[in-house]
Amino acid sequence: MARIAGVDLPRDKRAEIGLTYIYGIGPTRAKEILAKTGVSPDTRIKDLNDSEVAALRQVVENDYQVEGDLRRLEAMSIKRLMDIGTVRGRRHRAGLPVRGQRTRTNARTRRGARKTVAGKKKATR
């Protein structure tokens, strides 16, 4: 099993798809990496030899921010926005949509489950 950037790549997938299991590598970046290393995108992960895996590992680790480093970088960027008090930072802190979406309705994913508030009681006769 090929292990790149701390991720076990699925053996039966094509190299092009298998690389996308690494956080920070999507389909386009996977194609770039395979082109740089000269590995065919149609090769299965289990069919890669040790030198190809080593080449892939070297390109991923040296040229791209992936996995923990990328997550840390994103968290630090959001924290910076919150610290300097930008509108985006305040929206992050409040748990609201950051990019101008409406919040009167929808925005359920970002705001979380509904908190029911007791309504006005009906007058009994």
From Swiss-Prot:
Disulfide-bonded cysteines: none
GO molecular function, one term: rRNA binding
Pfam families for the chain: Ribosomal_S13 (PF00416)
Record keywords: Ribonucleoprotein, Ribosomal protein, RNA-binding, rRNA-binding, tRNA-binding
InterPro entries: Rbsml_uS13_C (IPR027437), Ribosomal_uS13 (IPR001892), Ribosomal_uS13-like_H2TH (IPR010979), Ribosomal_uS13_bac-type (IPR019980), Ribosomal_uS13_CS (IPR018269)
Region feature (Disordered): 93-125
A Gene Ontology BP annotation from the UniProt entry: translation
Function: Located at the top of the head of the 30S subunit, it contacts several helices of the 16S rRNA. In the 70S ribosome it contacts the 23S rRNA (bridge B1a) and protein L5 of the 50S subunit (bridge B1b), connecting the 2 subunits; these bridges are implicated in subunit movement. Contacts the tRNAs in the A and P-sites.
Family per similarity comment: Belongs to the universal ribosomal protein uS13 family.
Assembly information from the UniProt record: Part of the 30S ribosomal subunit. Forms a loose heterodimer with protein S19. Forms two bridges to the 50S subunit in the 70S ribosome.
Record protein name field: Small ribosomal subunit protein uS13
Classification lineage: Bacteria, Bacillati, Cyanobacteriota, Cyanophyceae, Synechococcales
